[in-house]
Amino acid sequence: MQRQLTFGGGVSPRNTRLRGQSIIEYVLIIAVIGLVVVFAGPGVAGAIRNQFSQVTNTVDSGTEGDSFISAEEKAYREAMKTVAGKEAKDWTLDEQKAAATDIAKNGTSSVVYAKAKAAMDAGTTWSVKLTNGKTMTYRIIGINHDDLADGSGKAGLTFWVDSFSCSGIRFLNNYTNKGGWEKSNIRQELLSGEVWNALPNDFQLKIASVTKKSLDSGSQGNSSCVDTPDKLFLASVSELFGGDSTEGSQYERFALIGLTMNSQLGKSDYRITYTRSVKANTRDEVWVLRGDAEPRYSAVASQTLHSFECIRFAFCF
């Protein structure tokens, strides 16, 4: 069983009180020193000034030091030291989530940003045992890339699943791409069906809901871009290959390896997987991704995924 870390933070009420009172206290002390100078002479006043400096230094250092931070903040910092002290490949599921949370909070200043970036660049993978007995591997493809669905900021890390075998699923049942990703069969599987249910409960709880954009139809002049809140999602053509960012910008990992519409993902992988992008100016086609040929390939939306095909989906922590 993995160790559950609890994180929190914030400036302690005690420190806030000291800061709030400090201006008034400074004024009163300065007034006292002024009176002492008049009635007792500069020698005594100098001694008082020294004591005053010590007090102000103590008050001013409260937020940056450890004297006035909360127990929760201390625990958070210690926990992040542990995560930062490990190689990213050795991060537990809890530590992956902790790293993502800290990166979302602190950006490039996060103590784990460099290690997460190095792991993304190197293609480092993690794995999780699914409820169906199979193992799923995944890797980082984006850092502070996706917008949280609640509007509170960015998801720290975006991951992409290497493959998830799921035969017998169609993008859409009817012979049209109308409705696009939002109404697709695959999205329902990712929301609450076979795919979602295969993930362990503690894994599900760590996944963040993000906003994804997609066109609702391939029909010329009749399509519009819609936003959907998604925990598991297929990558769009632009997130994979770059270019027009209507459905999102290219993930950093794919840009790093030079993936474009005219490149190959990898000849060793012959599987086919859907993207969430419908093909423009068509009535019934969607873009799919192939490893053994140019990704510029489309399929009829009602085509069924066969046993040699898979779903490659993404998620965020």
Please identify what each model-predicted range represents:
Residues 41-69:
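Aliphatic-rich helix starts adjacent to a transmembrane/signal segment
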Residues 1, 24, 46, 173-177, ...:
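Short intrinsically disordered, low-complexity coil segments enriched in acidic
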Residues 1-19:
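N-terminal leader/signal peptides at the extreme start of proteins
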Residues 20-41:
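N-terminal single-pass transmembrane signal-anchor helix
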Residues 72-317:
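Collagenous Gly-X-Y triple-helix signature in extracellular proteins
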Residues 5-7, 24, 54:
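Intrinsic structural disorder/low-complexity segments
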